[in-house]
């Protein structure tokens, strides 16, 4: 495997501040090439010291973001949709300051918001319109949108590869592309490798997560099959490891499936390189 390997900083919780700079140093020492940096603070000035530190450590970076109930992009309320769009535009501004050419995540709709029904044609239209305008802003900043689908328990707009492809087709913008997260795919897809092959050259980012959100190789996800599929489509971009702990309340993690963060960091990269 020749892809660069990254680590998602959400393992340490949602407080993404300079106290994590020592963690960045440990991640670099463990052999990682980059990190996923969650953009929750949408003040661009917040990310200037982050760019400096990542440049100092020669760590690549991918910006990721998530929207909560207050920024629901497919709300029936036009003011809410506008608010969500403006918030995501600010996330793009922060990604640019950070030095990332990609904004990844499920920001097509709000996490954990449901209506009791599948998405309507009107909601699908709102999503595509919102994302097209966001992609236009991303184009001005030389950033690509990497859209992620979530599983059925976290999102009702898109929860599988086919639905995500349909949404991105509807957006129809070169700066709006696809990403893959093995945690959600493990729940929703019949075959993980086939899902990746279906994404093909539109796949711009990959997150590898174990079925229990713990150390890679300690669960039942077939990562060898995933890596084979990535080779089949000539995927050469970063592969990020995503694991969560009880520090991330939104993920509903009630027990940690690892000894400590650095055990997970070290064992996961060693496992991935051994496949």
What do the PLM-derived regions correspond to, one by one?
Residues 11-14, 39-43, 70-71, 151-154, ...:
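Short histidine/acidic/glycine/proline-rich micro-motifs that form metal-
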Residues 36, 148, 154, 189, ...:
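Acidic-residue sensor for enzyme active/binding pockets
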Residues 33, 37-128, 236, 240-248:
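Structural motif corresponding to the early beta-alpha repeats
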Residues 1-11, 17-28, 99-101, 158-180, ...:
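Histidine-acidic metal/acid-base catalytic patches
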Residues 78-177, 259-262:
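Active-site acidic/histidine proton-transfer and metal-coordination neighborhood
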């Amino acid at each position: 495997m020749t892809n660069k390997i990254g680590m998602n900083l959400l393992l340490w919780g949602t407080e993404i501040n300079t106290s994590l700079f020592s963690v960045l140093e440990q991640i670099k020492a463990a052999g990682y090439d980059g990190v996923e940096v969650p953009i929750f603070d949408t003040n661009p000035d917040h990310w200037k010291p982050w760019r400096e530190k990542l440049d100092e450590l020669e760590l690549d970076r991918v910006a990721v973001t998530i929207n909560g109930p207050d920024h629901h992009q497919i709300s029936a309320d036009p003011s809410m949709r506008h608010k969500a769009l403006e918030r995501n535009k600010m996330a793009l501004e922060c990604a640019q300051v950070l030095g990332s050419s990609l904004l990844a995540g499920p920001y097509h709709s709000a996490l954990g918001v449901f209506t009791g029904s599948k998405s309507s044609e009107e909601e699908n239209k709102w999503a595509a319109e919102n994302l097209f305008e966001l992609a236009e802003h991303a184009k001005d900043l030389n950033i690509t949108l990497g859209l992620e689908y979530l599983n059925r328990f976290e999102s009702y707009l898109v929860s599988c590869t086919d639905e995500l492809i349909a949404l991105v087709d509807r957006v129809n913008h070169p700066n709006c592309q696809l990403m893959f997260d093995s945690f959600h795919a493990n729940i929703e897809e019949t075959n993980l490798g086939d899902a990746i092959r279906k994404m093909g050259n539109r796949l711009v980012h990959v997150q590898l997560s174990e079925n229990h959100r713990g150390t890679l190789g300690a669960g039942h996800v077939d990562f060898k099959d995933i890596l084979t599929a990535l080779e089949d489509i000539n995927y050469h971009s970063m592969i990020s490891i995503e694991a969560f702990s009880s520090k991330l309340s939104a993920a509903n993690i009630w027990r940690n499936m690892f000894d400590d963060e650095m055990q997970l960091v070290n064992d996961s990269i060693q496992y991935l390189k051994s496949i």
